[in-house]
């Protein structure tokens, strides 16, 4: 698909998702956060599943004008596929093969202002978006899944309450988190983090060439 056609698809997706998110947000007062003790964490972290996804994405987007520095981390099923033949773009081919064939499990976003300050008078500053994942169906590396389980990720919840990947991508488009030059993304060794997000946003496999991958990264982030 050409970049021109892809840009058109991005715009259409944004319009459709925006209409729905506005309808969802108009049914509640987003400026007054309704906290659910079962998903709230006293450390400033809120767990987001499909039942509170629309509300929390709206709450997050409302803060971005003043808190536009985003620390991002993802959890994914490990490195399952290996590239046997060494080549000039070995690392990118390995990244692409794994990202194309595996599913993102969790996206964590922490917001601050340019001084590194968390939002004032808000009960949390970090959103952990938990996506659909079924370990009986989806591919994973056993040691990675064990580590994630030990870290507290509940795979039964992900199977039953995880956010649909396509839905997540559609509404991420209208959240002001992406396609926004005012947002400053921060990640540590984040090629896989951005790779998984880019696959969701494009709605297809990662580009064949690394320079095209970089092109789309610069466009979205």
Regions found by a protein language model. Give the residues of each.
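Entry/capping segment at the start of metal-dependent catalytic domains
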Residues: 32-34, 39-104, 108-110
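Metal-dependent phosphoesterase core characteristic of DEDDh/y 3'-5' exonuclease domains
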Residues: 4, 102-221
